[in-house]
Design a protein with these regions (language model features):
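Paired small-residue
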Residues: 39, 50-59
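C-terminal ends and interior cores of transmembrane alpha-helices
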Residues: 34-47
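Intracellular juxtamembrane helix-capping segments at the cytosolic ends
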Residues: 65-78
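Symmetry-related core transmembrane helices of the 12-TM Major Facilitator Superfamily/SLC fold
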Residues: 117-136
Length: 152
């Protein structure tokens, strides 16, 4: 199951790059984060082996392209002299969040003996991510992209 998820995550990373070239990093991240949330929601309703493989595949198709979009967004929204530090901060926060999130969901499972609550925890954090990305998307549509300013 994990191998399937990771293999499709590779497809997601490459595909997200192509999509970002067409619609931008923020829009791509918004789509990927939303679809990752849908996949997390599906985990709540399926528990058979076959269905878990299918849901894991769906999850892999969307989660793999999320982290690379943080670097794309930093470069889209920031001047080159600030983008490097912002990318480092974004990736560090992502790594911390994944490490803490996995641990915290394990604690939730240990306390409740339920994967349902652990996946709900993931959905809450996904909603938080979607709120931030939605704000960036809305804000970015009102401003001229840095790339256009530099080209002028």
């Amino acid at each position: 199951m994990l191998s399937l998820m990771m293999a499709l995550g590779i497809v997601s990373r490459i595909g997200s790059g192509f999509i970002a070239d067409m619609i931008g990093g923020t829009a791509t991240l918004l789509i990927g984060s939303f679809m990752q949330g849908v996949a997390l929601l599906l985990y709540l309703y399926f528990n058979g082996l076959e269905s878990l493989f299918i849901v894991s595949g769906i999850f892999g198709l969307f989660q793999g392209g999320i982290v690379p979009m943080y670097a794309v967004i930093c470069r889209e929204l920031l001047p080159p002299r600030r983008a490097g530090a912002a990318i480092g901060l974004a990736v560090s926060a992502t790594i911390f969040g994944m490490a803490f999130g996995g641990y915290f969901s394990g604690v939730i499972f240990d306390l409740t003996s339920s994967y349902r609550m652990a996946f709900l925890n993931g959905l809450l954090w996904n909603a938080f991510n979607l709120a931030i990305v939605s704000w960036l998307f809305w804000r970015g549509r009102r401003r001229q992209p840095v790339g256009e300013l530099l080209a002028a």
